[in-house]
Design a protein with these regions (language model features):
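Thiamine diphosphate
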Residues: 1-169, 174, 184, ...
Length: 315
């Protein structure tokens, strides 16, 4: 069965994927540690604490201390995963990530739930709309967001094996199970969902499911879509973007500020490598508000309908 034919009603949050995978990895490698900031239940590390208590440290509500502790552990050969919310893991900890983790290029992983607008009713203060953009500008940092449960598990596994700082972003809400358990993923290499010739759609994270639904409808209307899951925005798969220039019309879709996120990363390659038209769908350079998640997406035009409309305008 192709991905376009899959039942997308079966859902699971990608933060749950992290919680399940980190237990597996911790049992396989005693050097893997989880550092919590008193929100283990929300970040799905409770099972890790129960099963591997000697590999867990809770620093309390002290994210900056967590980053410094992780850096210290990394110098002793440990592989620490700092687990927190995306808005804190990218901004509250930023100075420590830059100076203590990325500058010395230490093997620290920042694993963050509640990415993008998914905190929803918690309001704009808790919605990380700039996290991936901020951290992709820091040297040595890898930036990743899986689209669903299984892709996230595979990417967490790879993050544990690759040396260096990695930022992993997860959803708070449940998302459709797009991929099968046996699908393979490689950090820095796009996941091609479908080939096409009229327009290219590049999405990541939760917006892959929206791009998938839009693709189905566009195909019904005779528009051939190339659909890519760009789970890694740094290092970006430049070759995959350049290949889209054969089509020349690209739409990017992300639950992130359109400035300095996936859309900007794609535009950089297009500007450097050839001619093409790019339309960015994402958070419209504005703070969020307290509202249901789907309503926040709608307010920013991050919808199936807007993807279809934008595609037709380009064609």
């Amino acid at each position: 069965m192709s991905i376009l034919e899959k039942d997308l009603t079966v859902k699971k949050a990608t933060r749950e994927a992290f919680g399940d995978e980190i237990v597996k990895l911790g049992k396989e490698n005693k050097n893997i540690y989880v550092i919590d900031v008193d929100i283990a239940k929300s970040c799905k590390t409770v099972n890790f604490i129960k099963q591997l208590p000697d590999q867990h440290i809770n620093v309390g509500i002290a994210e900056q201390n967590a980053a410094g502790l992780a850096a210290g552990l990394a110098t002793t050969g440990k592989i620490p995963f700092v687990s927190t919310y995306a808005v804190f893991g990218s901004l509250r900890m930023l100075e420590q990530i830059r100076q203590e983790v990325c500058y010395p290029n230490l093997n620290v992983k920042i694993a963050c739930s509640h990415g993008g607008l998914t905190p929803a009713n918690d309001g704009g203060s808790h919605q990380a709309i700039e996290d991936m953009g901020v951290l992709r500008s820091v040297p040595n940092m890898t930036v990743i967001m899986g689209a669903d449960y299984y892709s996230t598990r595979k990417l967490v596994e790879q993050a544990a094996k690759v040396y260096g700082p990695v930022y992993l972003r997860f959803t708070r809400d449940t998302v459709p199970m797009i991929y099968d358990e046996n699908e393979e993923f490689t950090i820095g290499k796009v996941k091609k969902i479908k080939n096409g010739s009229d327009i290219a759609i590049i999405a990541n994270g939760d917006t892959v499911r929206l791009a998938l639904e839009a693709t189905k409808e566009l195909e019904k209307q005779g528009i051939s879509v190339k659909l890519l899951d760009m789970h890694t925005i740094k290092p970006l798969d430049r070759e995959a973007v350049v290949d889209c220039l054969n089509i020349g019309k690209i739409i990017t879709v992300e639950d992130h500020n359109i400035l300095n996120g996936l859309g900007s990363a794609v535009c950089e390659v297009v500007a450097e490598e050839g001619k093409g038209i790019v339309r960015r769908i994402g958070v419209q350079d504005q703070f969020g508000q307290s509202a249901p998640y789907e309503k926040l997406l709608e307010l920013n035009g991050i919808t199936v309908e807007n993807i279809i409309k934008t595609a037709k305008e380009l064609i």
